[in-house]
Amino acid sequence: MKVHFAGFTLLCLCTAVTITGCKPSNDNQSTGVSQDANSTTPPSAEQTKSVKISGAGASFIYPLISQWSADYNAATGNKINYQSIGSGGGIAQIKAATIDFGSSDKPLDSSELTKAGLGQFPSAIGGVVPVVNLDNIEPGKLRLTGPLLADIFLGKISKWNDAAIISANPGLHLPDTKINIVHRSDGSGTTFNFSNYLSKVSAEWKQKVGEGTSVQWPGGVGGKGNEGVASYVQQIKGSIGYVELAYALQNKMSYTALQNAAGQWVQPSAESFAAAASNADWSNAKDFNLVITNATGEGAWPITATNFILMPKQTKDAAQRKATLDFFKWCFENGQKQANELHYVPLPPNLVKQIEAYWASEFK
């Protein structure tokens, strides 16, 4: 089937999962973006000296980094090739020094960074949302508490008309339908944040499953990347999965409301992600190792997540490393509009200053 995106067309062997400016991935093909400016104007002298920057990792950030890449190419002529292969793959590739930067939604601790000779810094903030395939259930209408969500993924609640779900949704007609679980099959920062949240709200989940980029799921079918999970949920009636909000919105999927740590029912949005991030203490987080799920702020979305960029502290190619950092500097200075349009939260100026100071001290 043909899947159309901004400026190009591709042939896809899987069910279409669209993101503006992006393309989907499947188990046999990673997702990448390599953007060229669409112009018949001869390149300037500066553009003929353009560099190619390679990155790989989280599918969580792919919609945003794809748009940043296209706009950066148009502005500078430099080309960003980013492979959406999951956080685990991005960590592995940057450790193997096969790319210029890796991307992960799970921060590495200082000992792992030191062992690998890496530094890390945040790029943007977004949110993980439960998505469902239920007839006549509009986005945001189905309400779930954290413990309910954990019990569903534990397999303890197996029907959509279970009394516990009905109790949280008075007046909402729920079918006598089996709940089909969809989860990630690859190493995933999205999975890390989802399972980290469930571990905070369910002692049973923490004991039986725990948190990680990969976990032993009690049941369900696995999809590769946010793209794969979205595709499976769209195909399987009665299913529930979890994706980054941009994937849910662009594919017109039904997402749930969640009850946050303050007891409020909240909808996923850039505003609720910003509320969750508002009290994040980055200044005391060594190497920016901070997870912000289950935040206590008013209006906070419970599964808010940060994407992190990983780069080697030492390099034999100073010009290439400078070009890579220049890309992210450009994103921080010029990428707020794109972030807002795709429902991510741009980093606040004080955090950007902290990141730039980190670059100066850690990337030699």
UniProtKB/Swiss-Prot annotation:
One of its GO terms (molecular function) is phosphate ion binding. It holds the Pfam family PBP_like_2. Phosphate binds at A58, S59, F60, S87, D105, S188, G189, T190. GO terms for biological process: phosphate ion transmembrane transport. Residues 25-50 are annotated as: Disordered. The keyword Coiled coil does not apply. Gene3D superfamilies: Periplasmic binding protein-like II. InterPro entries: ABC_phos-bd_PstS, PBP_domain, Phosphate-bind_PstS. Part of the ABC transporter complex PstSACB involved in phosphate import. Belongs to the PstS family. NCBIfam families: 3a0107s03 (TIGR00975), PRK10918.1 (NF008171). This is Phosphate-binding protein PstS.
